[in-house]
Regions:
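Short, charge-rich, low-complexity alpha-helical interaction segments
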Residues: 1-6
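Acyl-thioester-dependent acyl-group transfer interface
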Residues: 27, 59-240
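Gly/Ser/Thr-rich phosphate-binding loops and adjoining beta-strand/alpha-helix segments
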Residues: 10-81, 203-206
Length: 240
């Protein structure tokens, strides 16, 4: 069992929604080139940018009540880049080699410190073993004959812990226009899990929030406003 499971705290972070409900995708587009240049200037990856946006937005939505809460960022790590990868594994397609890691982050004093904190935590995990452990552990959950997934009793409910999910999909469909990203999952009585994704096509940098159709509108507004605030911060950042 992954060690990080023992560090999770039961808490309801997301607004309650009435059932039935379904997932919709809200997308915001920005010019890619200036954002890419700004991120390189401060040596921060898009993934760290997403982590910073979501965790600061969630804390703002809760009006300071969870400022001292350590948040676990549930994200994919390419296990090919770790020291545990052999030559055969390195040749596999990406999604066959993506492990899951939970990266714990704390609130920092300002946006820049948050960006650097998230960058460093992400870098630590890329050189660690958590994603590899999860990759191996989850492979044992699949029944080879029926392909059913046997969920262990000790597996935490992702909807009811101090977990957020962000994922940068990277570069997609270069040369195409008006790209839209969509993903659906069920909303049950157990809850739901708003996801924040990013992708680019060399021209547009897109953020996509997956959320219930009847979620508190303030939640969406806070995510959007925080995205704009942090992107404007990196675009206008000047070293002291």
């Amino acid at each position: 069992m992954p060690e990080t499971w023992n560090k999770l705290i039961e808490i309801n972070l997301y607004p309650k929604v009435a059932l039935p409900s379904y997932i919709v995708n809200t997308q915001w587009d920005f010019d890619y080139a200036p954002i890419s240049k700004a991120l390189r200037k401060i040596n921060v990856t898009p993934q760290a940018l997403l982590m910073t946006i979501y965790q600061r937005a969630l804390r703002k939505y809760h009006e300071g009540k969870i400022d001292n809460l350590i948040l676990g960022v549930h994200t994919h790590i390419n296990c090919q880049s770790t020291k545990y990868s052999n030559d055969i594994f390195k040749k596999l397609p990406f999604f066959q080699t993506a492990g899951v890691a939970i990266i714990f982050i704390e609130k920092q004093e300002n946006i820049l410190d948050d960006l650097i904190h998230c960058r460093n935590k992400l870098k630590e995990e890329k050189n660690g073993k958590e994603a590899c452990m999860c990759y191996c552990y989850e492979s044992y959950l699949v029944n080879e004959k029926t392909m059913e997934i046997n969920i262990p009793e000790k597996m935490p409910n992702i909807y009811k812990h101090n977990l957020i999910f962000v994922s940068n999909l990277g570069k997609v469909l270069v040369g195409k226009k008006n790209i839209k990203f969509g993903l659906k999952f069920d909303i049950t009585e157990d809850g739901y899990w708003p996801n924040l994704y990013a992708f680019n096509n060399n021209e547009t940098f897109s953020l996509v929030l997956l959320h219930p159709n009847n979620i508190d509108k303030k939640f969406i507004e806070v995510i959007h406003d925080m995205s704009v605030e942090i992107i404007n911060f990196i675009l206008n950042y000047k070293e002291k």
